Amino acid sequence: MANYFIDRPVFAWVLAIIMMLAGGLAIMNLPVAQYPQIAPPTITVSATYPGADAQTVEDSVTQVIEQNMNGLDGLMYMSSTSDAAGNASITLTFETGTSPDIAQVQVQNKLQLAMPSLPEAVQQQGISVDKSSSNILMVAAFISDNGSLNQYDIADYVASNIKDPLSRTAGVGSVQLFGSEYAMRIWLDPQKLNKYNLVPSDVISQIKVQNNQISGGQLGGMPQAADQQLNASIIVQTRLQTPEEFGKILLKVQQDGSQVLLRDVARVELGAEDYSTVARYNGKPAAGIAIKLATGANALDTSRAVKEELNRLSAYFPASLKTVYPYDTTPFIEISIQEVFKTLVEAIILVFLVMYLFLQNFRATIIPTIAVPVVILGTFAILSAVGFTINTLTMFGMVLAIGLLVDDAIVVVENVERVIAEDKLPPKEATHKSMGQIQRALVGIAVVLSAVFMPMAFMSGATGEIYRQFSITLISSMLLSVFVAMSLTPALCATILKAAPEGGHKPNALFARFNTLFEKSTQHYTDSTRSLLRCTGRYMVIYLLICAGMAVLFLRTPTSFLPEEDQGVFMTTAQLPSGATMVNTTKVLQQVTDYYLTKEKDNVQSVFTVGGFGFSGQGQNNGLAFISLKPWSERVGEENSVTAIIQRAMIALSSINKAVVFPFNLPAVAELGTASGFDMELLDNGNLGHEKLTQARNELLSLAAQSPNQVTGVRPNGLEDTPMFKVNVNAAKAEAMGVALSDINQTISTAFGSSYVNDFLNQGRVKKVYVQAGTPFRMLPDNINQWYVRNASGTMAPLSAYSSTEWTYGSPRLERYNGIPSMEILGEAAAGKSTGDAMKFMADLVAKLPAGVGYSWTGLSYQEALSSNQAPALYAISLVVVFLALAALYESWSIPFSVMLVVPLGVVGALLATDLRGLSNDVYFQVGLLTTIGLSAKNAILIVEFAVEMMQKEGKTPIEAIIEAARMRLRPILMTSLAFILGVLPLVISHGAGSGAQNAVGTGVMGGMFAATVLAIYFVPVFFVVVEHLFARFKKA
C-alpha cells in the first residue's frame, strides 16, 4: 500500500485534501455541547389535587399513577413526590439510549389506564406528561429599573406575555415561573355571609352563572327563509372583566326586595393567582422564569434561542422592565470548549517543537505536522457521520489523539531519515525500504490501540456513553493516522526529504550539543540493557514489586464518577424550622444576599432568591438562591474558585439563627441531579411507616455527623414534619342537625384553601377567578369557629357545633422511590475523600439501621455505582483483546506476553501521578488508563517488532536482537513519548472553566506515559528475553 502512494504522491494529496474538506464541512455543521446525551431520558408526570394534603395526594393520586407504570421499556427507576400544596410529581428515568418520544407515548398510554381511578378534581385540572430534564438550564429574571412596577405587576406581565413564547422555543422542555399572573380574588367575610344566610357555595354558584360566556346563535341562521335578508350573531352574555363588575354579581334578593351583591359579603380585587413564592434580584422585587432543557436538546442552541426570543420580546416591554440572567450554565460550556480548543493548539505547537528538536530538519519536521490537521479534520468528518457532537469528551479524545497520530508519522519519518543517512539512498528508494521495515509495526500499533479502545464502545449506561465518545474519537483518529502514515507521509518523505549530504548534516551548536548528549545517553542505555540481561531474575522480582505497588495504589486511590467543576454559578438553599412563615424566610434570604454582595463582592456578580421554593419542596419555610459569579478571568487563584467561595460561605452562613443555610456546587452532569456529592434514597422496605422511617433517617444523619472526616453536609432533601391543625367532623351530629357533609367540606376547603371557579378576561388574556376567605379570617385556629354552614331547614350552624379541633404533626412532602416510601439524603465527601469513599461509608451506616430500612443510589450516584462495577470488566476485556490481537498479528503466543508485561509499568505511573495530585479514580482516569495501556504496548511493539525481524532474517540470538532493537528504536520511542507527554501537558496545568476534567484526563495519562517510557525501555528487553527462554524450554519439553 505504501509503495503505491510513494509512486503516486498527487493521489495521496488528493485523498488528504478530500478528508480535510469533509472535516471542515463537518465542523461547520456539528452541534456544540458540554457533554453528549449522557443523562438517561426522563419523563415527568405532574398532577394537582386542589386543597389536598400530602398524604391524600399520595394515597389518591401518586400511588394510583405509579401502580399503572408497569411494563415500560427500559425503565431504570421511578421517583415521586406528593406535597401539601396538592401537587403530585412522578419522574420516570429510562436507560440511556431509550427514545424519549417513545417513552413519553408509553407513559401517556399507561396514564390513560389510571385516569378513571383518579379524583374528579385531579382530572379537571389536567395531567401533564413532559420529557424535560429535571435540572434548570438557566434562569431569566425580570426587574423594574425605576421601581415603577411591583413584583406582582412584573410577574403578571411575564406570565401573560413571556412565559408562553419561551415554552414554545426550540429545545425548551418546560418553564417554571417564579411569580404569578393576576387572578380575580374574591375574599370572603364569614360574618357578612352569616348575616345574609349565605355560604361559600352560594357565591361560587352565582359567579359560575353570571360570569359565563354563552353562545347565543344567529339571527337568520341556516336553514333560512327564501327571502331572508338578515344574518347576525346573537350575544347573550360575556365574561366579566373588572373587580367592579364582579362586585355587582347578584347573590340573592331578600324578602324586602333588597339585593345582596358580591361586594356586600366579600372584597373583590385583582391579585396574584399564587402567593407561594417571593422572588428578589440583588434584594429588589423581581419575577423569574426557570428554563428546563428538553430531553436530547442542545443546551447552547436552546440558550441562544431563549435569549434571541427575549431580545425580540423586549421591544414590547414596559419602559422600566429589564431582563437579566442570574443563573446560566451555558457560558461554562462555551468557555470550557474554547479552553479545550486552545489546549489542542498548544499541544500541536509543543509536539512540533519536540519533533524539530529530535529530527533537527525542518523538512522532516513539517511532514508529521501536516499529518495533524489531516487526521483531526478527518476525525471530525467521522464524528459527524456517526451523529456525535463537538463536546468536552470528543475534544479530549482529539488532544490525546495528537500524541498518538504524530507517533505514526514520526516513526515513518525518523526511519526514512535513518535509512537515508545509514544506507546513503535517495529519498524515494529510502522510503520504499523504510516502509518495508516498519509497515508491519504501524499496523500492529493500530491494531493494538484500536483493540484497547474498542471494548469501551460496548459499555452501558451514562458511563458507557462517555466511554463511547472517547472510543470512537480515538479509534477513528488512530485508523486515519495509520492510513495517512502509509499514504501521505511516505509520499511526502519521497518528495520533500533530501538525500544526505557528504559528511552528513551539520547541526547547529544547540543541536550538536543535544546530539552529543543523546549519543552518550544511548550508549549508556545500551550498556545498561546488556547488564540487565545478565541478571533478568533480579529485575523480574523488581517488576513483581512494582506490580504489588500498583495493586496497593489501586486500592488506596479514591473513586468518583466525574470531577467537580467551577461552572461560574452555584446555589444556596435555606430551610427554616417547620411552621416558619414567608416573612421569616424572606429575611433569611436577604441575609444570604447581603453576605454574597458584600463579603464576596469581588467574586459574586448577582444573587437571585426565591422564597417558598426549593429542590426539597415548596413551602413557606423553604428558600433557594442562585449565585452568579464573575468571569473566570476576574477570579484568578484557588481562593477565588467556586469551591473556596462555597467553603467560606458555609462557615459564614451557618451563624444565621433558626435556619439551615447550605451552599452547594452543581453536579458535573446537570441532568443527573441538583447538587454535587452523593444522592441516596433511604427506603422503607419493611413498610414500617412514615414515623419509623423518619426516626431511621434521623439516626442516619446523627451517625454521619459523628464522622466529619468521612462525610460532610449530610442532609435530607425534603421537608420536616410540620404542625397541622386537624378538624374532626362528627358526621352523626352534623347529620342530626341537617348539615350535609359535602357542604362542610366545601366551606372549609374554600375558606382555608381556595376554590377555582372559572375564568375572566384581563387585557385580552383569559385568567382565573378564585374564592377564598379574607386574610383576617384564616390566620388563627379560632377562625374556624367563625364559619357557618346552612342546614336543610335554612338555618346557619357554626362549624364548632358539630366539629372539634386538635394539633397534630404530618409531612408537607412525601417521597417514594420505585413505589416504596423513601427519603432522599444528600451529602458531600469530606476533604481528602472521594464520593466513592463517601458512598461506601454511607452504605455501611445504613446497615446499622433497624431491619426493614434499605437504600438505593439515584442520579449521579447511581451512575457512579454502575461505573465502578463496569471498570474491572473494561480493563480485563481490553487486555484480553490486545493480547489476542497481538497473537494474531505475530502468529505467536510468546510475543504478546513480551508486550503485555509492560502494561503495569504504565499503570503504576498513572496511579502514582493521580494519587500525588489528590485526584480520584474516575471515568476520565479510566479512559486515561486505557490510553496508557495502549501507549505502553506501542513502545514495546516498536522494540519487539525489530528484535523478532532480526532473529528471523539475520539469525541473531534473542539477547543480541533485543539489544540492537532497543538501541535502534530508542530515539523514536523517546521522541514520540516526549511529544505525547508535552501534548497533554496543557491539560495537566489547565485552570479555570473545565479544568477539573482536563486535569483528570491529563494527569493520569502523563504520569502513565512517563513511567511507561522510563521503565519500559529497560524492562521490555528483560521481558523479551525471559519470555523467549521460557517458551523455548516449553517447546523442548
Swiss-Prot record:
Residue ranges in the Cytoplasmic topological domain are: 1-9, 360-369, 414-441, 493-534, 892, 949-972, 1028-1037
* Membrane-spanning ranges: 10-30, 339-359, 370-390, 393-413, 442-462, 472-492, 535-555, 871-891, 893-913, 928-948, 973-993, 1007-1027
- Pfam families with a match to the protein in the record: ACR_tran
Q: Which SUPFAM superfamilies match?
A: Multidrug efflux transporter AcrB pore domain, PN1, PN2, PC1 and PC2 subdomains, Multidrug efflux transporter AcrB TolC docking domain, DN and DC subdomains, Multidrug efflux transporter AcrB transmembrane domain
Q: Does the keyword Translocase apply?
A: no
- List localization entries: Cell inner membrane
One Gene Ontology term, aspect cellular component: plasma membrane
Q: What Gene Ontology terms for biological process does this UniProt record contain?
A: response to antibiotic
Q: Which GO terms describe its molecular function?
A: efflux transmembrane transporter activity; xenobiotic transmembrane transporter activity
The UniProt entry lists membrane topology as: Multi-pass membrane protein
InterPro entries registered for this protein in UniProt: AcrB_DN_DC_subdom (IPR027463), Acrflvin-R (IPR001036), MdtF-like (IPR004764)
Keywords from the UniProt entry: Antibiotic resistance, Cell inner membrane, Cell membrane, Membrane, Transmembrane, Transmembrane helix, Transport
Q: What spans does the record annotate as topological domain Periplasmic, numbered to this chain?
A: 31-338, 391-392, 463-471, 556-870, 914-927, 994-1006
Q: Which family does it belong to?
A: Belongs to the resistance-nodulation-cell division (RND) (TC 2.A.6) family.
Query: Do you know which PANTHER family this protein is assigned to?
Result: MULTIDRUG EFFLUX PUMP SUBUNIT ACRB-RELATED, PTHR32063
What this chain does, per the entry, is described as: Part of the tripartite efflux system MdtEF-TolC, which confers resistance to various compounds.
Query: Whom does it interact with, and what assembly results?
Result: Homotrimer. Part of the tripartite efflux system MdtEF-TolC, which is composed of an inner membrane transporter, MdtF, a membrane fusion protein, MdtE, and an outer membrane component, TolC. The complex forms a large protein conduit and can translocate molecules across both the inner and outer membranes.
**Name recorded for this polypeptide:** Multidrug resistance protein MdtF
Q: What organism does the UniProt record list as the source?
A: Escherichia coli O157:H7
Q: What is the lineage of its organism?
A: Bacteria, Pseudomonadati, Pseudomonadota, Gammaproteobacteria, Enterobacterales
The gene name on file is: mdtF
